[in-house]
Amino acid sequence: MCGRFLIDYEFRDLIDKYNLAKYQGSANRGEIFPSQKVMTIVQKYAIAMDWGFDFKWSNKKIINARAETIFEKKTFKNLARSKRCIIPASAYFEWQKKDDQKIKYKIFDHSESILSLAGLYHIRFDDENNKMYQFTILTKEAEEGIRNIHNRMPVIIEKDNTEEWLFSEKIDQLRLNDIINNQKLSFEAKIQ
Protein backbone atom coordinates (compact mmCIF):
# COMPACT_ATOMS: atom_id res chain seq x y z
CA MET A 1 0.00 0.00 0.00
CA CYS A 2 1.07 3.56 -0.52
CA GLY A 3 -0.70 5.89 1.90
CA ARG A 4 1.57 8.94 1.73
CA PHE A 5 4.30 10.31 -0.46
CA LEU A 6 6.64 13.30 -0.63
CA ILE A 7 6.95 16.11 -3.15
CA ASP A 8 10.04 18.27 -2.69
CA TYR A 9 10.96 19.06 -6.29
CA GLU A 10 10.26 22.25 -8.23
CA PHE A 11 7.56 22.24 -10.91
CA ARG A 12 10.11 23.24 -13.58
CA ASP A 13 11.82 19.88 -12.88
CA LEU A 14 8.67 18.14 -14.17
CA ILE A 15 8.70 20.18 -17.37
CA ASP A 16 12.24 18.99 -18.09
CA LYS A 17 11.83 15.37 -16.95
CA TYR A 18 8.58 14.69 -18.83
CA ASN A 19 9.01 17.15 -21.73
CA LEU A 20 5.69 18.76 -20.88
CA ALA A 21 3.72 20.90 -23.30
CA LYS A 22 1.26 22.38 -20.82
CA TYR A 23 0.11 22.34 -17.24
CA GLN A 24 -3.28 22.89 -15.66
CA GLY A 25 -4.08 23.88 -12.06
CA SER A 26 -2.00 24.16 -8.91
CA ALA A 27 -1.11 21.49 -6.40
CA ASN A 28 0.34 20.68 -2.99
CA ARG A 29 3.95 20.07 -2.01
CA GLY A 30 5.52 18.42 1.03
CA GLU A 31 4.08 15.27 2.56
CA ILE A 32 1.01 14.30 0.53
CA PHE A 33 -2.05 12.66 2.07
CA PRO A 34 -5.04 11.02 0.34
CA SER A 35 -7.60 13.54 -0.96
CA GLN A 36 -4.95 16.20 -1.57
CA LYS A 37 -4.45 17.72 -5.01
CA VAL A 38 -1.13 16.94 -6.74
CA MET A 39 0.31 17.34 -10.23
CA THR A 40 0.05 14.20 -12.32
CA ILE A 41 1.38 13.54 -15.81
CA VAL A 42 -1.08 12.58 -18.56
CA GLN A 43 0.73 12.23 -21.88
CA LYS A 44 2.47 15.63 -22.36
CA TYR A 45 0.40 17.51 -19.78
CA ALA A 46 0.62 18.10 -16.05
CA ILE A 47 -2.85 18.14 -14.51
CA ALA A 48 -3.73 18.79 -10.88
CA MET A 49 -5.74 15.82 -9.59
CA ASP A 50 -7.17 14.68 -6.26
CA TRP A 51 -5.66 11.53 -4.77
CA GLY A 52 -8.32 8.85 -4.44
CA PHE A 53 -11.34 7.72 -6.42
CA ASP A 54 -14.77 8.61 -5.02
CA PHE A 55 -17.32 6.05 -6.12
CA LYS A 56 -20.90 6.07 -4.89
CA TRP A 57 -20.70 2.36 -4.08
CA SER A 58 -17.63 2.78 -1.83
CA ASN A 59 -17.69 4.42 1.59
CA LYS A 60 -13.98 5.30 1.39
CA LYS A 61 -11.60 6.69 -1.21
CA ILE A 62 -9.75 4.17 -3.36
CA ILE A 63 -6.16 5.42 -3.13
CA ASN A 64 -4.39 2.27 -4.39
CA ALA A 65 -5.04 -0.46 -6.96
CA ARG A 66 -3.21 -3.78 -7.16
CA ALA A 67 -1.32 -3.82 -10.46
CA GLU A 68 -1.63 -7.60 -10.65
CA THR A 69 -5.41 -7.40 -11.07
CA ILE A 70 -6.26 -4.08 -12.77
CA PHE A 71 -7.11 -5.75 -16.08
CA GLU A 72 -9.52 -8.12 -14.29
CA LYS A 73 -11.34 -5.74 -11.95
CA LYS A 74 -14.42 -4.02 -13.32
CA THR A 75 -13.48 -0.80 -11.51
CA PHE A 76 -10.09 -0.52 -13.22
CA LYS A 77 -9.95 -2.48 -16.49
CA ASN A 78 -11.19 0.29 -18.81
CA LEU A 79 -9.03 2.88 -17.03
CA ALA A 80 -5.99 0.58 -17.38
CA ARG A 81 -6.40 0.63 -21.16
CA SER A 82 -6.84 4.36 -21.67
CA LYS A 83 -6.49 6.45 -18.50
CA ARG A 84 -2.95 5.86 -17.29
CA CYS A 85 -0.93 8.56 -15.58
CA ILE A 86 2.27 9.15 -13.66
CA ILE A 87 2.40 10.67 -10.21
CA PRO A 88 5.81 12.33 -9.73
CA ALA A 89 7.11 11.83 -6.17
CA SER A 90 10.42 12.41 -4.42
CA ALA A 91 9.83 9.49 -2.02
CA TYR A 92 7.04 7.56 -0.39
CA PHE A 93 6.35 6.57 3.19
CA GLU A 94 5.52 3.24 4.79
CA TRP A 95 5.04 2.18 8.38
CA GLN A 96 6.61 -0.94 9.83
CA LYS A 97 4.67 -2.63 12.60
CA LYS A 98 6.92 -3.64 15.51
CA ASP A 99 5.23 -4.96 18.60
CA ASP A 100 2.63 -2.30 19.41
CA GLN A 101 4.41 0.51 17.53
CA LYS A 102 4.43 1.78 13.97
CA ILE A 103 7.78 3.06 12.68
CA LYS A 104 7.62 5.52 9.77
CA TYR A 105 10.10 5.04 6.89
CA LYS A 106 10.89 7.34 4.00
CA ILE A 107 11.67 5.21 0.92
CA PHE A 108 13.53 6.72 -2.02
CA ASP A 109 16.19 6.12 -4.68
CA HIS A 110 19.40 8.20 -4.57
CA SER A 111 19.82 7.96 -8.35
CA GLU A 112 16.35 9.42 -9.11
CA SER A 113 15.24 12.74 -7.62
CA ILE A 114 11.75 12.20 -9.05
CA LEU A 115 10.13 8.77 -8.98
CA SER A 116 7.40 8.12 -11.56
CA LEU A 117 4.63 6.33 -9.67
CA ALA A 118 2.22 4.49 -11.96
CA GLY A 119 -1.39 5.51 -11.66
CA LEU A 120 -4.84 5.42 -13.20
CA TYR A 121 -7.14 8.40 -13.37
CA HIS A 122 -10.76 9.17 -14.07
CA ILE A 123 -12.88 12.25 -14.51
CA ARG A 124 -16.10 12.78 -12.64
CA PHE A 125 -18.46 15.69 -12.11
CA ASP A 126 -19.48 17.13 -8.77
CA ASP A 127 -22.99 18.28 -7.81
CA GLU A 128 -22.45 21.64 -9.57
CA ASN A 129 -21.27 19.83 -12.72
CA ASN A 130 -17.62 20.87 -12.23
CA LYS A 131 -15.06 18.52 -13.77
CA MET A 132 -12.93 16.69 -11.16
CA TYR A 133 -9.82 14.67 -11.93
CA GLN A 134 -8.96 11.86 -9.51
CA PHE A 135 -6.17 9.27 -9.46
CA THR A 136 -5.17 6.08 -7.72
CA ILE A 137 -1.62 4.69 -7.35
CA LEU A 138 -0.80 1.19 -8.60
CA THR A 139 0.94 -1.09 -6.12
CA LYS A 140 2.85 -4.36 -6.39
CA GLU A 141 4.60 -6.81 -4.11
CA ALA A 142 7.45 -5.02 -2.36
CA GLU A 143 11.03 -5.38 -3.58
CA GLU A 144 13.28 -7.54 -1.43
CA GLY A 145 14.90 -4.67 0.50
CA ILE A 146 11.52 -3.15 1.36
CA ARG A 147 9.56 -6.29 2.33
CA ASN A 148 10.68 -6.15 5.95
CA ILE A 149 8.95 -2.74 6.22
CA HIS A 150 5.77 -3.42 4.20
CA ASN A 151 4.60 -6.15 1.80
CA ARG A 152 3.41 -3.68 -0.91
CA MET A 153 4.98 -0.72 -2.70
CA PRO A 154 4.07 1.65 -5.54
CA VAL A 155 4.77 0.58 -9.12
CA ILE A 156 7.56 2.84 -10.40
CA ILE A 157 7.75 3.50 -14.14
CA GLU A 158 11.37 3.79 -15.23
CA LYS A 159 12.47 6.36 -17.80
CA ASP A 160 12.70 3.78 -20.63
CA ASN A 161 9.02 2.88 -20.13
CA THR A 162 7.53 6.34 -19.49
CA GLU A 163 6.32 7.06 -23.03
CA GLU A 164 4.90 3.58 -23.44
CA TRP A 165 3.03 3.85 -20.13
CA LEU A 166 1.57 7.26 -20.99
CA PHE A 167 0.81 6.78 -24.71
CA SER A 168 0.58 3.12 -25.75
CA GLU A 169 -2.77 1.52 -26.49
CA LYS A 170 -1.13 -1.90 -26.34
CA ILE A 171 -0.39 -2.23 -22.64
CA ASP A 172 -1.98 -5.35 -21.20
CA GLN A 173 -1.38 -7.37 -18.04
CA LEU A 174 1.60 -9.22 -19.54
CA ARG A 175 3.35 -6.00 -20.59
CA LEU A 176 2.59 -4.38 -17.25
CA ASN A 177 4.13 -7.41 -15.51
CA ASP A 178 7.29 -6.94 -17.64
CA ILE A 179 7.49 -3.28 -16.63
CA ILE A 180 6.97 -4.18 -12.96
CA ASN A 181 9.48 -7.03 -12.90
CA ASN A 182 12.31 -5.26 -14.72
CA GLN A 183 12.83 -2.34 -12.39
CA LYS A 184 16.47 -1.39 -11.89
CA LEU A 185 16.04 1.14 -9.11
CA SER A 186 17.71 0.56 -5.76
CA PHE A 187 15.64 1.80 -2.87
CA GLU A 188 16.84 3.12 0.44
CA ALA A 189 14.71 3.41 3.56
CA LYS A 190 15.32 5.82 6.43
CA ILE A 191 13.44 6.04 9.71
CA GLN A 192 11.64 9.38 9.99
Briefly describe each language-model feature range.
Residues M1-Q192:
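Short linear sequence motif anchored by a di-proline
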